[in-house]
């Protein structure tokens, strides 16, 4: 698959964030992609009014897609941007308001959305989120092998199930245990769906014997952990303000009876160990497969890891974290 070259590269060390042995890049088409996604959102009537559209735009969803997939073709970047917009709308629906603490309603909604995505039930096209999700699904179905669509849908399913787990916890006012949280965070972040989208940068999606190999699975797990843990770090201020307990720092503070600052330090240590582990796994992968496609996939994983942090810093989610530590630690 052809790709557009990136035009923006940032240093390997972003002030205030985490260090990586690889640099972040941004797709040069992000502004055009954003305008096309906003037009798509309006055309499908995914939001009710201009205020909601402005709120969606403020999330910098297209910039996230551009930082995660800097070498994508224009078509793949547009798909990722549109999917990210729908995912952010889903996050708002599940995490805010009465639904966030109503597991019975979440379970009903999950059955509805998953039934529609997998084609088990007739789609309710009056639901804007249904319209958005099915549009993304159909574009994948038309352009890529069915086995890839099923892989992506299976990982998307985990996201819905994790939302039910979170709603149950909120209703019970329960902070999850560390090991449980580490497992479920991989699903609540929907990162596996983006690991799948990275395969669209290759000539063909990875075959089963490759994608299910323990080494490649470890690569994807590490990528998932790093993205989710750094997101927990950057969104800590907002989530503490909202009383959200599904955050690794909050879980660490609760499990270890530590201060907030100590929990942050532990997250950073866990993060750095995962980065070091990735470097070792990467060497094993390249020793096993002398394949340009595998190397391209690893390059894409690294770009996504570094790009996720760059987007978070660009979006301003880091501001005020130090003062928050002083207040809450």
Swiss-Prot record:
Reaction catalysed by this enzyme: (2E,6E)-farnesyl diphosphate = (+)-eremophilene + diphosphate
EC annotation from Swiss-Prot or TrEMBL: 4.2.3.164
Locus of motif DDXXD motif: 91-95
Entries under Gene3D superfamilies matching the protein: Farnesyl Diphosphate Synthase
Coiled coil: none
A Pfam family assignment: Terpene_syn_C_2
Root EC class: lyase
Entry keywords, A to Z: Lyase, Magnesium, Metal-binding
Binding-site residues, Mg(2+) 1: 91, 96
Binding-site list for Mg(2+) 2: 96
Transmembrane segment boundaries: none
Cofactor info, note text: Binds 3 Mg(2+) ions per subunit.
Pathway membership, UniProt: Secondary metabolite biosynthesis; terpenoid biosynthesis
Protein's UniProt keywords contain Lyase: yes
Family matches, as InterPro entries: Isoprenoid_synthase_dom_sf, Terpene_cyclase-like_2
Cofactor: Mg(2+)
Residues that coordinate or bind Mg(2+) 3: 231, 235, 239
GO BP terms in the entry: terpenoid biosynthetic process
GO molecular function, one term: terpene synthase activity
List of residues binding substrate: 185, 238, 317-318
Domains: entry comment: The Asp-Asp-Xaa-Xaa-Asp (DDXXD) motif is important for the catalytic activity, presumably through binding to Mg(2+).
Function: Catalyzes the conversion of (2E,6E)-farnesyl diphosphate (FPP) to yield the bicyclic sesquiterpene eremophilene via a 1,10-cyclization, which requires the abstraction of the pyrophosphate from FPP to yield the (E,E)-germacradienyl cation. The only accepted substrate is farnesyl diphosphate (FPP).
Family statement: Belongs to the terpene synthase family.
Protein known as: (+)-eremophilene synthase
Species: Sorangium cellulosum (strain So ce56) (Polyangium cellulosum (strain So ce56))
Gene: geoA
